Regions:
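Secretory targeting and sorting signals
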Residues: 2-24
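Extracellular/luminal regions of secreted and cell-surface proteins that mediate adhesion/ECM remodeling
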Residues: 24-313
Length: 313
């Protein structure tokens, strides 16, 4: 339903808005963001080196369908989850600024436009109608208890991939409420980190507190974004920050996180949009039988971290 609605909304957006909105390929030079995906399991703000990637665990749960769940003893568990923190950073020249909007609460999702910072006077559009660029993205109100705010959907994807390149498991959760949650480890080398005053500083102050219309399912507009030199992360204990590995055989795999996979958001560079960690999975007492409990939790070891690379094993 959401996919169908998103397609219809994008068609309507193109027909009704694009004629009056400024074009992104004309006028002054724009300073664009560069989204860098951190390796999965690495806390926000770390360099992605393997010893620092400790923000993950193996969690047996009773209900395989629950968004979250208390980790329990394998003897009563029906599923095993690999939980991991995910983080995305902006290391570009300009902020990532996205405005979502819908006409009424009868629409389940909001269409999204990307606002671009000008390089001449530093101005940043202040709302949806002024934003220069239509996107294929949309926002959706996530009702799960740990969220209850508007998510930018399809922003990031998780996948467990075999050494032969076959995707074994993919994510359910791929939406984010974006804001400035941490400083990137190499912020000192970036030329356009917000200062103390000006449009970038004003935007950063807003994004540091941005909760994406928390507890506001009837909102008609929402802001999502990340300033230069900042990043957004979701901790591994949050709803949907996991892959179900109950049926994954013993072996070596890549855990791959990818941001802006469809390139609907304009960036200076797409080469660093995926990062991976190589890991081994083994079942000391064999895999669970379908519908049964877990004989023993699998042993999972991180072998390598590969920042900016989609393959690692």
């Amino acid at each position: 339903l959401l996919k169908k609605f998103a397609v219809l909304a994008l068609v309507a957006l193109t027909a009704t808005v694009s004629a009056s909105a400024p074009r992104a390929d004309t006028g002054p030079d724009f300073l664009l963001p560069d989204l860098r995906q951190a390796p999965p399991g690495c806390a926000g703000g770390s360099s992605g080196e393997l010893p620092l990637c400790t923000a993950w665990d193996v969690c047996p749960v009773i209900d395989p369908a629950a968004p979250n769940g208390r980790c329990v003893a394998p003897s009563v568990a029906k599923a095993v989850r690999l939980r991991f923190t995910s983080a995305e950073e902006n290391v570009g020249d300009g902020p990532l600024v996205l405005y979502g909007r819908r006409e009424s609460t009868q629409q389940a999702t909001m269409t999204v436009r990307q606002a671009l910072r000008t390089g001449t006077d530093g101005s940043i559009p202040g709302g949806y109608r002024a934003a220069q660029r239509a996107t294929g993205a949309f926002t959706y109100y996530e009702p799960a208890l740990a969220h209850q705010h508007w998510h930018l959907m399809n922003f990031e994807h998780f996948a467990l991939v075999s050494r032969q390149g076959k995707t074994v498991v993919t994510d359910r959760k791929n939406g984010f409420c974006l804001g400035d949650r941490f400083e990137v480890h190499d912020a000192g080398r970036l030329a356009h980190v917000p200062g103390d005053t000006g449009p970038d500083a004003d935007l950063a102050a807003t994004l540091r507190e941005n909760m994406c219309r928390h507890h506001e399912p009837t909102a008609l507009e929402v802001l999502e974004g990340i300033s230069v030199g900042s990043g957004d992360d979701y901790k591994f204990t949050v709803d949907f920050q996991w892959l179900d590995i109950t049926r994954v055989p013993t072996g070596t795999y890549d855990l791959v996180n990818t941001v802006n996979a469809d390139r609907t958001l304009l960036e200076t560079n797409y080469r660093n949009n995926s990062s991976a960690v190589a890991m081994s999975i083994s079942w000391p007492q064999g895999m669970p039988e379908p519908g049964g409990t877990v004989p023993a939790a699998p042993i999972v070891r991180l072998l390598r971290s590969c920042p900016g690379q989609p393959r690692c094993a």
